[in-house]
Amino acid sequence: MGQSLTTPLSLTLDHWKDVRDRARDQSVEIKKGPLRRSGTVAPASGGAGAPGLAAPVEAMTEYKLVVVGARGVGKSALTIQLIQNHFVDEYDPTIEDSYRKQVVIDGETCLLDILDTAGQEEYSAMRDQYMRTGEGFLCVFAINNTKSFEDIHQYREQIKRVKDSDDVPMVLVGNKCDLAAHTVESRQAQDLARSYGIPYIETSAKTRPGVEDAFYTLVREIRQHKLRKLNPPDESGPGCMSCKCVLS
């Protein structure tokens, strides 16, 4: 406890940057096999049965995820917790960081390409660019910060504008659920998510509950979005209505 009072700020920031860099390095070291993006299968090298060649590596689907939210809500901490199973509580404002992690979700081997974005208002002009490339979005607020919850509407509207669509895969994430003090109640967040037609998940980047669930749920939302585009509902039929399951 005494150490936290005497450790120079420069050292804590250096520690944060070291952990972040190691998480980046770890993501870069992922074995580079064939990828399929947006449902397109990449060709495997070496045909089946070719003499002296190993069997082709199964193609992975790449998902481009973007983490958005106000400054200080724990976007970087969530991402590093997923990538490296490590929590860093020193705050070092992010401009833009990219991470990659290979995972298996519902039996499918996936490569998550995660963009951790700036929450500071002075970088708002950069948002359009990374929103164009993202397939799905984690919209993060802190449950002890009412303003960050109110800001979610702004991020969602910007995403819809940039993507020129009302149907964009998103997950609402209430971070810092390990804290005793809540200024945003679970029911408020659930009601907001329900009005948007998206899942809501509470997370703690510090103690890890909900972290994998948040990212994996977003991947599932992207999959469902692709299926809807391939098989659009027949809106001419009687009683047809669009709906989306909301997790709470």
UniProtKB/Swiss-Prot annotation:
A lipid is attached at residue 245 (S-farnesyl cysteine). It catalyses: GTP + H2O = GDP + phosphate + H(+). Alternates between an inactive form bound to GDP and an active form bound to GTP. Activated by a guanine nucleotide-exchange factor (GEF) and inactivated by a GTPase-activating protein (GAP). CDD domains: H_N_K_Ras_like. Residues 246-248 form a propeptide. GO terms for biological process: signal transduction. It is found in: Host cell membrane. Residues 28-48 are annotated as: Disordered. Its EC number is 3.6.5.2. This is Transforming protein p29. It comes from Rasheed rat sarcoma virus. The lineage of its organism: Viruses, Riboviria, Pararnavirae, Artverviricota, Revtraviricetes. The gene is RAS.
